[in-house]
């Protein structure tokens, strides 16, 4: 039984955001039609490493993987681990498939990735408690208006769910370039200090990107085009 509270006003019961943008290019559509069904999550049943990859292995989950650069990089770096990602935006899924496919067939496909085109919360609810080694939430939609604050993924209900699904010693990584969301997220995590230990020892630990944490296209644009500062947070499940 998880600590996830479906009636909590700080709990979102579905992910908000757009589902599709500009039309897909021909190659992207081909990947959606051909590759996505091969590496999609099963429609029913518990989501475990054994069910997805045929053997026990450390399991990583990325919520809203954007263009998939981070997920593909980490999966390629850790071939003995299993990576799952959820993204409701079809164009992001298509971009991720380009990375996973080995840049449209120029390299061998990355075999240890599974994708869900849809709501990350649906996936989390099907993962047995204590199963995840890593959970990533990188640059989620900040929903800056106060009346939309309950739509933020960083709220008490979802964070309780994160804690339930991570194993003891597992790691939750959060990144943002939005100052309002930064303050909101830290307030939320402070309320969950009994579940998570913040791994920062000094300011550099959250102002400098850690090793093995690649810069995504979104992050690069935030820094270079908009001049945003980016913050990186690592929390260990107690």
Curated annotation (Swiss-Prot):
Its EC number is 2.1.1.33. Pathway: tRNA modification; N(7)-methylguanine-tRNA biosynthesis. It catalyses: guanosine(46) in tRNA + S-adenosyl-L-methionine = N(7)-methylguanosine(46) in tRNA + S-adenosyl-L-homocysteine. S-adenosyl-L-methionine binds at residues 62, 87, 119, 141. The active site is at 141. One of its GO terms (cellular component) is tRNA methyltransferase complex. Substrate binds at residues 145, 177, 216-219. InterPro entries: SAM-dependent_MTases_sf, tRNA_(Gua-N-7)_MeTrfase_Trmb, tRNA_methyltr_TrmB_bact. GO terms for molecular function: tRNA (guanine(46)-N7)-methyltransferase activity. SUPFAM superfamilies: S-adenosyl-L-methionine-dependent methyltransferases. PROSITE patterns: SAM_MT_TRMB. Pfam families: Methyltransf_4. Keywords: Methyltransferase, S-adenosyl-L-methionine, Transferase, tRNA processing. Belongs to the class I-like SAM-binding methyltransferase superfamily. TrmB family. Catalyzes the formation of N(7)-methylguanine at position 46 (m7G46) in tRNA. This is tRNA (guanine-N(7)-)-methyltransferase. It comes from Novosphingobium aromaticivorans (strain ATCC 700278 / DSM 12444 / CCUG 56034 / CIP 105152 / NBRC 16084 / F199). The gene is trmB.
